[in-house]
């Protein structure tokens, strides 16, 4: 029976969507804008021969009605299209849950105040339950900036650094040695329980190391504590029917470990890619391998590093043929994204954009999937592939990728 591989190139948006005006994101285009910035800075065109052959660049051109400097080729061996998000937010859980067939049609809770962001009553509850005398931060911040600003005070006082953003998150940074990784995880678990009716999507543990503001750096031991999806995702449905669902990276955390049978953690593009290849080489028939390449978002999108983002895409492109070589005749590969995070855009937050929908198997020719009305088309296609009950949202494109 077939195996499927889903790889999420985290934050690779391909052009602002029609509702971007509601998010202040009209003009955002993660892919095109980073490619332009790369060309302007280096004088080089981004070199993506393998992703372009799959239709990634063509999908961006169709979604945004614009082009950009690149070296590549016309689509020749993959189905390509672009999908619009119908979920109310542009956050990680919303994007992933929607691509798994369950869009988020309710409003998340947010901490909207830029300073003194958390309710006093919540902070009091956290201090009482954890035994700490207070918190540092209590504001909107980027993860790197707040470590530079408060990392030393955290080491000296022992107080956790708590901060948020435009997303529905409560983030907690703590030093792995001075605070302790297990203590950080326990603290996050307590906060998750105390958030209660505030409807906050995720509590995120952000461990770091270093001995001064000059070298504080996050580690790969991040952990996300998500609420449950509002309905069974396609992962739940196929797992219940016997498909072996494998998470690589932070997928299991995003889905609150629901519908996941096996988990592999890894840090960095190459380690995540290697773990994915290992599973392709060893996974049984009737398996789904689901990988999130988080570094595109956290290392380059949020940090507004267009040049680094472009180089990382080139590094990914070099490795794409390894997927083809590892895949069996029955396997199908999907490449997509969960939202945008334009590294040329003001601020540090996600951007509301179309995402690519790319599909590949060994017998496929080039197929234009066009404009998909929801990320859930991917989940519906996976449901059909594994012959389980249809999802409530989305239109399968499975017949289109096997029609030629």
Curated annotation (Swiss-Prot):
The keyword Transmembrane does not apply. GO terms for molecular function: magnesium ion binding; manganese ion binding; phosphopentomutase activity. Binds 2 manganese ions. It is an enzyme of class 5 (isomerase). It comes from the Bacteria. It catalyses: 2-deoxy-alpha-D-ribose 1-phosphate = 2-deoxy-D-ribose 5-phosphate; alpha-D-ribose 1-phosphate = D-ribose 5-phosphate. InterPro entries: Alkaline_phosphatase_core_sf (IPR017850), DeoB (IPR010045), Metalloenzyme (IPR006124), Phosphopentomutase_DeoB_cap_sf (IPR024052). Mn(2+) 1 binds at residues 10, 338-339. Mn(2+) 2 binds at residues 297, 302, 350. Its cofactor is Mn(2+). Keywords: Cytoplasm, Isomerase, Manganese, Metal-binding. Its EC number is 5.4.2.7. One of its GO terms (cellular component) is cytosol. Pathway: Carbohydrate degradation; 2-deoxy-D-ribose 1-phosphate degradation; D-glyceraldehyde 3-phosphate and acetaldehyde from 2-deoxy-alpha-D-ribose 1-phosphate: step 1/2. It is found in: Cytoplasm. GO terms for biological process: 2-deoxyribose 1-phosphate catabolic process; 5-phosphoribose 1-diphosphate biosynthetic process; metabolic compound salvage; nucleotide metabolic process. Belongs to the phosphopentomutase family. Isomerase that catalyzes the conversion of deoxy-ribose 1-phosphate (dRib-1-P) and ribose 1-phosphate (Rib-1-P) to deoxy-ribose 5-phosphate (dRib-5-P) and ribose 5-phosphate (Rib-5-P), respectively. This is Phosphopentomutase.
């Amino acid at each position: 029976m077939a195996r499927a591989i889903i790889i999420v190139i985290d934050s690779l948006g391909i052009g602002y969507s029609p509702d971007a005006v509601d998010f202040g994101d009209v003009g955002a285009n993660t892919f095109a804008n980073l490619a332009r910035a790369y060309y302007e800075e280096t004088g080089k065109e981004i070199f993506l021969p393998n992703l372009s052959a799959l239709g990634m660049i063509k999908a961006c051109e169709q979604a945004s009605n614009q082009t950009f400097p690149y070296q590549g080729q016309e689509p020749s061996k993959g189905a390509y299209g672009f999908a619009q998000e119908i979920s109310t937010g542009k956050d990680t859980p919303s994007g992933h849950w929607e691509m798994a067939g369950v869009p988020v049609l309710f409003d998340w809770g947010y901490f909207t105040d830029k300073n003194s962001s958390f309710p006093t009553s919540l902070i009091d509850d956290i201090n009482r339950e954890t035994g700490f005398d207070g918190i540092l931060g209590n504001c909107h911040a980027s993860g790197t900036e707040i470590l530079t600003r408060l990392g030393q005070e955290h080491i000296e006082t022992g107080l956790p650094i708590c901060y948020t953003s435009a997303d529905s998150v409560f983030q907690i940074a703590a030093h792995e040695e001075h605070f302790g990784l297990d203590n950080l995880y326990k603290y996050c678990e307590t906060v998750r329980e105390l958030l209660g009716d505030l409807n906050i999507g995720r509590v995120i543990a952000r461990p770091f190391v270093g001995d001064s503001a000059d070298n504080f750096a996050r580690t790969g031991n991040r952990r996300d504590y998500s609420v449950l999806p509002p309905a069974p995702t396609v992962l739940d449905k196929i797992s219940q029917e016997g498909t072996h669902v494998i998470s690589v990276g932070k997928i299991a955390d995003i889905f609150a470990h629901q519908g996941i049978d096996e988990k592999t953690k890894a840090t960095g593009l190459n380690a995540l890619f290697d773990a994915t290849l290992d599973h392709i080489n060893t996974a049984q028939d009737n398996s789904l391998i689901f990988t999130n390449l988080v570094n595109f978002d956290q290392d380059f999108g949020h940090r507004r590093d267009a040049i680094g983002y472009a180089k990382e895409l080139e590094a990914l492109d070099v490795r794409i043929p390894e997927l083809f070589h590892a895949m069996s005749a029955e396997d199908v590969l999907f490449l997509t994204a969960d939202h945008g995070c334009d590294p040329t855009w003001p601020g540090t937050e996600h951007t509301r954009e179309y995402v690519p929908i790319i599909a590949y198997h060994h017998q496929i020719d080039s197929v234009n999937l066009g404009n998909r009305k929801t990320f859930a088309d991917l989940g519906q296609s996976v449901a059909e592939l594994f012959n389980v009950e249809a999802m409530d949202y989305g239109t399968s494109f499975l017949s289109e990728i096997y029609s030629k």
